[in-house]
Amino acid sequence: IETIETIFEKRDQAENWFKFCHTFLMPYTTSIISNPAYTGADEVVAGDFIRQQFAYNWAGFYIGDGLQMTADPYGNIWRKDAAYNAIRYCNTFLEKIGGVYNMEEQEKVLWIAEIKALKAHYYFELLRRYGPIILVPKNVATNAGIGEMKQPRAPFDTCVEEIVTLLDEAMKDLPPMNQKSVSRRA
């Protein structure tokens, strides 16, 4: 039976977790359909033809047309399977990577730095879309009480400081772009 502890025993399994932490990133940043930053302004317009021809939820078009909703917002990354889930995976990685026995320390340091930068990006995306957010430096236990699970939003400046801190910590261990192998370039 595979558990989080057994996943973080061997490098190959830890690498799968490492890669999975990155999978949440693509829909938020690169998708013209789900990232409202591309099409959510008044400069881009679309008629019903676009909406009816494609089964996709063109979040930006709806926002640009003034149809954003509070109950079920377009481009929502606060939902349970999005950014905070990604942050939880990143936190788990940061907590458990030290237990991998067949991995060089230098590679662990590199992966930790990349995950910190990734976590900072998830925080940035949340902050950009929602203003002050809930910061999660460590995972809350799944069996924690409601009082422990209810966390307040941090002030805006604190959120920015946390993002900068994570990036500063990551930067000192990440090689410059021209020194990375092609497969490691973002």
Predicted regions and their residues:
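Aromatic-lined, polymer-binding surfaces characteristic
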Residues: S181-A186
